[in-house]
Amino acid sequence: MPAFDIVSEVDNVELKNAVDNATRELATRFDFRGVDASFELKGENIKIKAEDDFQLSQLVDILRGNLAKRGVDARAMDIKDAVHSGKNFYQDIDFKQGVDTLIAKKLVKEIKASNIKVQAAIQGEQLRITGKKRDDLQAVMALVREGDFGQPFQFTNFRD
């Protein structure tokens, strides 16, 4: 019986490349010359540091652009509030890994409401979709791509 998994993952290598490119771009930008600003990647967390709140938003825009160039979906970013400490502003950005249980339930509900003849099962941080026809599975893929669930999804483990 054909099946596939719906997962939400961020490629850590591409994430590191995007942060490195953003750091290089930061070094060449005229408006950041002589400014204490930086990106710091630790695991799946990026810490941004700048001297001003406006510069912090500029750094987030630089990072978003570089993530898009590297093929990392910016919807996976979970941007925390800016923290002011001393003369610097800091902001943490986490990246969502895995399908959250609330979003998974929302996905299952959406799939069942579409009346496509498939079964959806939540398996930890992923969803397994099973159906009798490949066309039904492709219809579910299209449905998930069109829906706005606040998180990017990838389709893996397609079995026929």
From Swiss-Prot:
CDD domains: YajQ_like. GO terms for molecular function: nucleotide binding. One of its GO terms (cellular component) is cytosol. Gene3D superfamilies: 3.30.70.860, YajQ-like, domain 2. Keywords: Nucleotide-binding. It comes from the Bacteria. InterPro entries: DUF520 (IPR007551), UPF0234-like_C (IPR035571), UPF0234_N (IPR035570), YajQ-like_sf (IPR036183). The keyword Nucleotide-binding applies. Pfam families: DUF520. Nucleotide-binding protein. NCBIfam families: PRK05412.1. Belongs to the YajQ family. This is Nucleotide-binding protein VFMJ11_1323. It comes from Aliivibrio fischeri (strain MJ11) (Vibrio fischeri).
